[in-house]
A protein has these predicted regions:
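DNA major-groove recognition helix of helix-turn-helix/homeodomain DNA-binding modules
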Residues: 45-60
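Short basic helix-loop element that most often maps to the first helix and adjoining turn
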Residues: 5-24
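Short, charged recognition helix plus adjacent turn
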Residues: 64-68
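Conserved hydrophobic/aromatic packing and binding residues within compact polymer-binding modules
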Residues: 7, 21-22, 32-35, 61
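Key DNA-contact positions within bacterial/archaeal DNA-binding proteins
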Residues: 19, 30, 40, 59
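A detector for short, charged/polar N-terminal pre-domain segments
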Residues: 1-2
Length: 68
């Protein structure tokens, strides 16, 4: 599963909007939108924070492992 699709799936499973995820990560909603479209990628710090927020490893976040 592509990275962006995985981020979107995990975000929705967590019940978060793009805006809410952006606020928790300290980025703009546009940044989250770009990540989900695979037109940009987050910094390692943001990947680590997302993995904590979603309860998955960074590897699972990057590789699109199906189980959160």
């Amino acid at each position: 599963m592509p990275f962006g699709q995985n981020v979107q799936r995990l975000r929705r499973a967590a019940g978060l909007s793009q805006e809410e995820l952006a606020e928790r990560l300290g980025v703009t909603r546009q940044a989250v939108s770009k990540w989900e479209r695979d037109s940009a990628y987050p910094e390692m710090e943001k990947l680590a924070r997302m993995s904590q927020l979603f309860g998955v490893t960074v590897e699972a976040l990057l590789n699109g492992d199906p189980a959160p």
